[in-house]
């Protein structure tokens, strides 16, 4: 059979994981494909295109400004870099050398997770230093405040990671984290790469939040950063320094605009019904087959996305 996989000598993939980078993230949506195909044939002023993206995307995110970068991971590094440099070009050119800069990033220990690469490394690529707080399983508000009090003059920003990778960690709740940072005049960066409810973080008064364009939105590979205008401008300036190696093409910028707009205009009720039909099909399948050594249950998304998963448990002492 001459399928895409056999023709290109690729291993066929049946995706039961979700939007994972390792398997190509997602199936690209039609609007993003059309947008990319249109702009491929034109020269454009990238600054102007990013300005248009900012206006159109920030309207949906309900925040002041936005920009497109190469990926959410790139956005993490650039956002941290901007908190150390501000709009000072001499500092931007100097990175990753952060001598004489406020270069510490406050983060709860359980948020130093690995999503395929380490959050720690994404932060340190900018030249910043990790200031972790809390214990192995828990972090408290008092621990955060104590850490801030002892290190305040060296803290450039604070990062909060929203991900199923660290959902079991007893972290300080995000609204309390942001409120505490505001009280101490520390800007907040939210790493929410795979989270659907994007505008939620700006309702909580986050200064910057980072999302993936090519996961649940199904756009081309890119990261979307939203937030307060002064911070977004400083992040964009990183393209004159370490951000140059993380630059994003015109096609990904244009596609992200249309991908996000399509996402917000989708029929959510229909989408949830379709997901539930698939879950019910597989539940019925396992109930009817009654496999020995296999159990299963539906697991709600741990960070609040509107999806459920069917988790399969295999007893390898019984089932081979």
Q: For each of these PLM feature ranges, what is it?
A:
Residues 39-40, 47, 91-94, 271-278:
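Charged, low-complexity, helix-prone segments enriched in Lys/Glu/Asp/Gln
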Residues 2-27, 54-57, 62-66, 73-264, ...:
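Conserved PLP-enzyme active-site core in the AAT-like
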Residues 60, 264-298:
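Conserved PLP-dependent catalytic core of the aminotransferase class-I/II
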Residues 14-52:
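A glycine-/small-polar-enriched, mobile loop at the entrance of the PLP active site in fold-type I
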Residues 44-48, 91, 156, 247, ...:
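Residue-level signal for secondary-structure boundary elements
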Residues 4, 290-320:
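Conserved C-terminal alpha-helix-loop-beta "cap" of PLP-dependent enzymes
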């Amino acid at each position: 059979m001459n399928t895409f996989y056999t023709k290109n000598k690729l291993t066929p993939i049946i995706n039961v994981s979700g939007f994972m980078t390792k398997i190509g993230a997602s199936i690209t949506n039609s609007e993003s494909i059309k947008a990319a195909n249109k702009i491929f044939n034109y020269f454009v002023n990238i600054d102007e295109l990013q300005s248009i993206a900012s206006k159109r995307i920030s309207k949906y995110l309900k925040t002041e400004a936005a920009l497109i970068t190469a990926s959410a991971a790139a956005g993490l590094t650039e956002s941290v870099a901007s908190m150390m440099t501000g709009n000072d070009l001499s500092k931007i050119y100097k990175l990753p050398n952060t001598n004489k800069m406020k270069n510490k990033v406050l983060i709860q220990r359980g948020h130093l997770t690995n999503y395929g690469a380490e959050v720690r490394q994404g932060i340190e690529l900018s030249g910043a230093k990790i200031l972790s707080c809390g214990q192995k399983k828990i972090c408290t508000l008092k621990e955060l405040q104590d850490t801030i009090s002892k290190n305040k003059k060296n803290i450039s920003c604070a990062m909060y990671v929203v991900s199923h990778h660290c959902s079991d960690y007893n972290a300080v709740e995000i609204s309390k984290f942001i409120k505490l940072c505001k009280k101490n005049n520390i800007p907040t960066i939210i790493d929410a790469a795979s989270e659907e409810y994007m505008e939620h973080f700006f309702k909580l008064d986050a200064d910057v939040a980072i999302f993936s364009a090519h996961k649940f939105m199904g756009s081309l590979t890119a990261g979307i950063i939203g937030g307060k205008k002064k911070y977004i401008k400083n992040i964009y300036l990183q393209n004159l320094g370490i951000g140059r190696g993380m630059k994003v093409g015109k096609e990904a910028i244009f596609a992200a605009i249309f991908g996000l707009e399509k996402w917000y205009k989708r029929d959510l009720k229909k989408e949830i019904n379709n997901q539930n039909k698939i879950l019910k099909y597989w539940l019925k399948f396992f109930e009817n087959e009654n496999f020995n050594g296999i159990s299963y249950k539906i697991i709600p998304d741990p960070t609040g996305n509107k999806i459920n998963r069917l988790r399969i448990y295999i007893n390898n002492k019984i089932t081979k």
